[in-house]
């Protein structure tokens, strides 16, 4: 979306050199924009122990106005690459591996297979607000809170988690973009 891809890969390699493990590379799958690059992303798992994750395009932020043709279910990857073998899931990602590959492939399906009921995530925004749901307007400021007050605020955020999203009916309720939320 922004910046230089070579710089991004240099950062990933620097993280590896620093001893970070279980690196995940997320990419939003968009029909007629980057679906011709799926094989390139999959090939990264052949030589690196990374998890390359494909996320379905969600109607939030600037993407909410995009045409529906941009939406491509990530399960399309399974149709195009039948050699992918399913392995144990991890969080919200269904995981696969190419035969002989070092890394894995994750498919995250917020649109085609909603997983809200199993979501155990909360997020803290760059400006210090807790969000119980990626798509909710509800936020709790954590700035200046300590000890019991902080614990109570986090618990409130967890208890406010909705049972599901409404993305198939309308765009996300949050006015924030993913990079503001921490997604």
Regions found by a protein language model. Give the residues of each.
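Radical SAM/AdoMet-radical enzyme domain recognition
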Residues: 1-55
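Auxiliary Fe-S-binding modules of radical SAM enzymes
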Residues: 47, 57-183
């Amino acid at each position: 979306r922004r910046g230089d891809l070579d710089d991004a890969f240099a950062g990933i390699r620097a993280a590896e050199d620093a001893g970070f493990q279980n690196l995940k590379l997320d990419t939003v799958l968009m029909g007629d924009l980057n679906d011709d690059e799926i094989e390139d992303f999959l090939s990264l798992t052949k030589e690196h122990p990374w998890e390359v994750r494909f996320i379905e395009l969600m109607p939030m932020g600037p993407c909410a106005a995009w045409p529906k043709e941009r939406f491509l279910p990530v399960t399309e990857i399974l149709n195009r690459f039948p050699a992918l073998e399913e392995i144990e899931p991890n969080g919200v990602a269904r995981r696969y591996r190419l035969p002989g590959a070092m890394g894995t492939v994750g498919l995250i399906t917020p649109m085609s297979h909603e997983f809200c009921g199993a979501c155990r995530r909360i997020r803290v925004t760059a400006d210090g607000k807790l969000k119980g749901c990626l798509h909710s307007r509800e936020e709790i400021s954590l700035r200046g809170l300590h000890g019991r007050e902080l614990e109570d605020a986090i618990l409130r955020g967890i208890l406010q988690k909705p049972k599901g999203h409404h993305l198939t009916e309308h765009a996300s309720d949050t006015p924030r973009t993913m990079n503001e939320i921490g997604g």
